[in-house]
Amino acid sequence: MTTPADDQGKSPENPWPVRAVATRVAKYIDRLGMVWIEGQLTELKIRQTTAWMVLRDPAADMSLSVSCPRDLVANAPVPLSEGTQVIVLGKPQFYTRNGSFSLRISEIRAVGIGELLARIDRLRRLLDAEGLFDPRLKRPIPFLPGTIGLITGRASHAERDVMTVAANRWPAVRFAVRNTIVQGPNAVPQIVGALRELDRDPGVDVIVLARGGGSVEDLLPFSDETLCREIASCTTPVVSAVGHEPDNPLCDLVADLRAATPTDAAKRVVPDAAAEQAFVTDLRRRSARALRQWVHREQHHLDQLRSRPVLARPLQAIDARADEVHRAVAAARRDVRRMVTVESERVGHLSARLTTLGPAATLARGYAVVQTMPDTNVLRTTADAPAGTHLRIRVADGAITAVSEGTDEAH
């Protein structure tokens, strides 16, 4: 069975008063007891007896108000400043009077360099497993960028080095500079914001992230997971020029190009106008030399061809062949005439033989050819010419017609 107190706060007709809610929240929080918390100092204000700090979680971009006795800060194992990574022991508190939440700490420990490096290594393995370091994902750096996006500290040596070296190499180079904090708890949000702004600018062809050297703590923002993932998501090529040669923050592995120093970044992003001009001049010189050598070789080859007898007197071979043609034509004509004479004589002989062996010669010797009419069949027997048969008798000088009177028995 529920009581009116159990139903309080569950309907607009029976609301809780503020004091009741605040008291309940304070009781819930008080049950947490003492807890160890790790974070990064973003603010530190010291009053007469109390120190006020803000602890930030870089991975989640959340913060928590912290208070402690002033002596606790003064006796901390390391000097405390904005950006210091610490582990604190404290008791969460909820102040019912103003509804604020805070952490009252009683112990401060610094996160050692070894632990920081171990965490960076764990994050490195995680990002590597996700493929963020894959060389196949690296975007090519343009040969001559129209505008270079530069993210760096205001009036820093890194900014001066990049811009000075780039201008000396290519005087017409253009920059879109975004000055940000490059260390401490606020560095990551500012750098990420600058990256997004430059990546959205269609006129920016490459982005350079530049910072001078520093301690492991100083370079922590450049191994931040949020920043690394933002670099990986950029569509514009990103060059990491953070620290000096020995430094190796995680952004170096995610970026499309890692430069050892800001000066090295300027050299690798901007071509050297003098060197390019010298290269073009050398190309022109080598091209001209190659062309001259080719012309010389071809001229020498042509001279060799022209020195050959056939080219020195090109008509000589034609004349020699013409004489051969004339001789061949004359020989062909002689052969044709001889063949015509021989064949004419042969035809004469054949004609004479034909005349001798032909029927005309037989008729000339007194013989006759008798044919029955009108079928002109040659008469071979007397039976073929009974009485009354019309006959045609062919003799040497013509033909005679006759009529058979019958047969006469041969004796």
From Swiss-Prot:
Protein's cellular compartments: Cytoplasm
Domain of life, source organism: Bacteria
GO terms of biological process kind: DNA catabolic process
Keywords: Cytoplasm, Exonuclease, Hydrolase, Nuclease
First-listed, main subcellular location of the protein, grouped into a coarse class: cytoplasm
Top-rank EC class of the record's enzyme: hydrolase
GO CC, one annotated term: exodeoxyribonuclease VII complex
EC number(s) stated in the UniProt entry for this protein: 3.1.11.6
One Gene Ontology molecular-function label: nucleic acid binding
Matches recorded under Pfam families: Exonuc_VII_L, tRNA_anti_2
UniProt keyword annotation of Hydrolase present: yes
Function: Bidirectionally degrades single-stranded DNA into large acid-insoluble oligonucleotides, which are then degraded further into small acid-soluble oligonucleotides.
Recorded family membership: Belongs to the XseA family.
Oligomeric form and interacting partners: Heterooligomer composed of large and small subunits.
PANTHER family per the UniProt record, alphabetical: EXODEOXYRIBONUCLEASE 7 LARGE SUBUNIT (PTHR30008:SF0)
Protein name: Exodeoxyribonuclease 7 large subunit
Organism: Mycobacterium sp. (strain KMS)
Annotated gene: xseA
